[in-house]
Amino acid sequence: MYVLKNGQVLNASGKLESKDVLIQNGKVNLIADSIEVTSGEEFDATGKLITPGFIDVHVHLREPGGEHKETILTGTKAAARGGYTTICSMPNTKPVPDSKEVMESIQAKIKETAKVRVLPYASITTSLGTDELVDFEALKEAGAFAFTDDGVGVQLAGTMYEAMKRAAALDMAIVAHCEDNSLIYGGVVHDGIFAEKEGLKGIPNIAESVQIARDVLLAEAAGCHYHVCHISTKESVRVVRDAKRAGIRVTAEVSPHHLILDEEAIPGNDGNWKMNPPLRSKEDRAALLEGLLDGTIDFIATDHAPHAAEEKNVPMEQAAFGIVGLETAFPLLYTHFVKTNEWTLKQLIDWMTVKPAECFKLPYGKLEEGSVADIVVLDLEKEANIDPDTFYSKGKNTPFVGETCIGWPVATFAEGTLVYNEGEIK
């Protein structure tokens, strides 16, 4: 049992209120002006913000098969440090969770080593990226969170349509990395100013937006919840906005780096700035910000993609796609958007908690009496530089090295257990 004393919580209107929070038996037992108990442990939250634990539906944990990049243990330590209490792990592992047996083995490893809640995706196709569909019913029974081939787009419309029909019958979501391989043209960055300057092959916007346009129509026909991963282009935002207006059940996420950076920020041919989707144009970034504010884009997800140093500390042509994000998302977003008064604090917290929970019908993301005690304590005055040497993640691949941010998680409770406190994993 813990009593969080003298903290602040956000009320429904976004105002800060001084409250104590009692955690008992993994639940939020009481929220009150003052709580006095004779047993349990007191946690001093004076001057700190107490919020629901963050939810990230887009995380690459790499295990099994990629343990040199990340493991379930190191990835969930990184999540705890970043304030995340629920993360959803992508299926681009070796082996791929395309069968009940593999899914059950991943679930067993999660139970054995994870520091926070991990909800694993199953793949849509066998081996990920084929045209043979998995056994949706068996994988749901084995505990799959949803279905995705993240890392590659499902190329054939017929394959995607059949997948959507099967997912809809089970009331489960299809989560899509949207990329038409015939429109990539071997690109490694956005097809724009930076590509031209560096003489690199570019990935055009239409590689993403064309597949989203196809898929929203398939989702409408199938009656499926269709979720767009890491949306990155103005055309994609327009397609999703139009689909929502038409009543199609589509949701979308955006990554912190696509909100903060665009192609003009890239300093040179450095593999740590290579990600998929790539950093797009200023106009694309503006459309993402507008789409998030008007509800076209539903929430924020990191696309945490750790790699070994030798896979990133090379020119872009040779580097792996992806950057890490679990340990830096909140401080970066708070610094860039809340401290600059572009967003309210409540907007940011909602986009990292209740919004993803609502989209995927998860019973988390709220701080109220009776809720699961997934809680992060935030010090909104704490200032620190982003230093990959301090990361719990095995991946150190971030373009934000050395950036000074204000507002950091200082403690994380997962189902009432203190898993992170002042720089230390418990």
From Swiss-Prot:
GO annotations under biological process?
Answer: 'de novo' UMP biosynthetic process; purine nucleobase catabolic process
UniProt entry keywords in alphabetical sequence: Hydrolase, Metal-binding, Pyrimidine biosynthesis, Zinc
> What InterPro entries does this protein's entry cite?
Amidohydro-rel, DHOase, DHOase/Allantoinase_Hydrolase, Dihydroorotase_CS, Metal-dep_hydrolase_composite, Metal_Hydrolase
Q: Which CDD domains does the UniProt entry name for this protein? A: DHOase_IIa
Question: Where along this sequence does the record place binding of Zn(2+) 1?
Answer: 58, 60, 150, 303
MF-aspect GO terms? allantoinase activity; dihydroorotase activity; zinc ion binding
Functional pathway: Pyrimidine metabolism; UMP biosynthesis via de novo pathway; (S)-dihydroorotate from bicarbonate: step 3/3
What role does it play? Catalyzes the reversible cyclization of carbamoyl aspartate to dihydroorotate.
Spell out the HAMAP family in the cross-references.
PyrC_classI_B
Q: What is this protein called?
A: Dihydroorotase
Q: Which gene encodes it?
A: pyrC
